[in-house]
């Protein structure tokens, strides 16, 4: 059953605790007592199966995110925010969690945050945990309630101060303050399953209405919300639930008194419905600049991991080594490249941007790696492509493999020339290949899917039945059509919207999948070009790109007016790049377009080609260091040239100036002659692109470049 660390004698008994708690900051005599030490209740179980079959091998809170266990991020956040005692409640795989914590810095005698581990096979929900908190009288004042898969750098001192002040002034009426972060509905860290719409009192931040939006097309609000408020009501759909709650001791008591409360959402809805009867209120605290998110599915895992690599969770960045682990020593270089100790990178391999290489990892020759995290002691063969790939410890990827937006768990192996389409998952020790393509959404595990049926009664118990399952595995063979001729594993799920279980498929590991039939008539009838769909895949929302483009334009305008140096302009553009989750490719496209458009923004009316060049060329000269910062490789040159071509196809009256513009790019050493010639000679182009290349001035410029190249070759 349960093993519980000794609870300090300072904890009051139940008779004293029922008085409503000391969280309101009461007074004694003439002087106010200082606030008691801050406590936290950390729930190290999700009580759902969103991460199955991954979490069949290890609990969610121990899954590595940027090579650090999720629970370590949560405990670091709690400690940084001033928590001095944390109760960690474990159920599923409790022994693994306990072992991890006991070996970590959190259980060291010098830890500022005393971690007490409480385990039980009987917990089935958050409600069970909080009823146990109440039964054991663990909390003696306001406490933080949080799951062990939350990543945050929020300073909650202001929210805590507001919470305590409210309880003092209103005689403990407010029992909970929920922490939210401002976030647009299209932001990558918005989880569809957790999206909520709130009605909030404009003056007091009291939550009046709380509704999950999953599966809803329309929302309704009680009319009384608006009739009873003197100061106005805000309807908010721009908030991300950080799953951080400041609770009074009454919260645990209310869960005891209401056994139908199983989740925090049950609790919130129950209190709002019965507010007039019980007199309890819930408030919210909103942060705009800090970071907080819960890793509730693989979509959120990917989004939060990307944010850590891009340094949005500072100071929780990979090179900081906040876990004090000898294997977490990283160096950080430009474009967010992180390398652990004893990393080997083969000749011709390119780490493009946002890449983390774990200690002891070996990368072969001519590999391309971008937006990926590779765990310790991995081996990557030659000519491998990794794009948004997440590899855990000891993974092996053979030559010629391609992995796109997929997850490979501990010691998984990908054989030669295997292609993983987006949203694939290989759980621990799975082998696939060689020469196989895994369809999008494939999940391969060493645990047979039919073993699920045998576990329904004991799905939250510990791993006592693991040996029985291993015996079942031995009796069942692997299907080479699913995992390849040398593969080892069973196919759990391949997304197929034609199956009857499409609701379950949409609730896959990667989160809620959009059902196209539910889109509005206008959207569903709109025809979309396949190239447009390709361009959207793996890139931010179009709205974010438009906003980024406007921000870059504003930055350059201000730079020109205030004479800001190019180095500082690069810093500002980089910060915008990370803010809107923009790739380097898109930065080059936007930068090229914005600069070429700049003269048109400054002059009313139509510009002729000569006047346009007169305005543009000085700008190119002034901002050439900005271009050179982003345009380095041949692929970068071609992307910039494609953006230049697109601009002139949009502004056909300016095509006569294209040759002068390209000459300026060439003379300023932004674009190289070989890439300009390569761009001009492209065959797979549109009719308009072919027509553009027939421009006489452009052809003369290309001929001049070719002759210059020949002369250079003769001189050599």
Swiss-Prot record:
Residues 538-715 form the W2 domain. Residues 451-466 have a biased composition (Acidic residues). The modification Phosphothreonine is found at residue 317. Residues 523-535 have a biased composition (Basic and acidic residues). GO terms for molecular function: guanyl-nucleotide exchange factor activity; translation initiation factor activity; translation initiation factor binding. The modification Omega-N-methylarginine is found at residue 18. It comes from the Eukaryota. Residues 18-28 have a biased composition (Gly residues). SMART domains: eIF5C. One of its GO terms (cellular component) is eukaryotic translation initiation factor 2B complex. Acts as a component of the translation initiation factor 2B (eIF2B) complex, which catalyzes the exchange of GDP for GTP on eukaryotic initiation factor 2 (eIF2) gamma subunit. Its guanine nucleotide exchange factor activity is repressed when bound to eIF2 complex phosphorylated on the alpha subunit, thereby limiting the amount of methionyl-initiator methionine tRNA available to the ribosome and consequently global translation is repressed. Belongs to the eIF-2B gamma/epsilon subunits family. This is Translation initiation factor eIF2B subunit epsilon. It comes from Rattus norvegicus.
